[in-house]
């Protein structure tokens, strides 16, 4: 019904094979008695599977990881809202906790109304297809200073985008943590180009 909400989830969390399957449906007028729903009127299917072998002949390598993650979302009448496939092509975890990874994605979206992403930069309604890939590395969180850097490049609505994100973790004193994040985006659209910069700092005590 218009007020209903339903869903189901299956998980298979194991060391070699890790799988997940979930389905969720929210009616157009669903109104939770506690909390809030960020979006109504959709059906969403999300399957994920990962293969994570542990090479016995690579002394410095703890585990490899390969996987694919899908998301298929429609409105209540079955019209496509979003369809995304993320391929985690390769991830390597070393014995010291450091990691390196590479992946790619294909995204299909339907925009039902025009959207002004920035002043005088309007994305018109319609169907959009985008492709992109990312590469990154991170150090172990057990270090007093840990870091992560990732770069993404791909399609973005009517144009292209390049993104660089860095994270820094400082853990010099027990019970006190400092987290910093920096993200830079260089966006080029048919309606114009723009750049964004985001800073985030979190202190945990």
Task: Set out the residue ranges of the language-model regions.
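Exposed, low-structure sequence patches enriched in small/polar residues
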Residues: 1-205
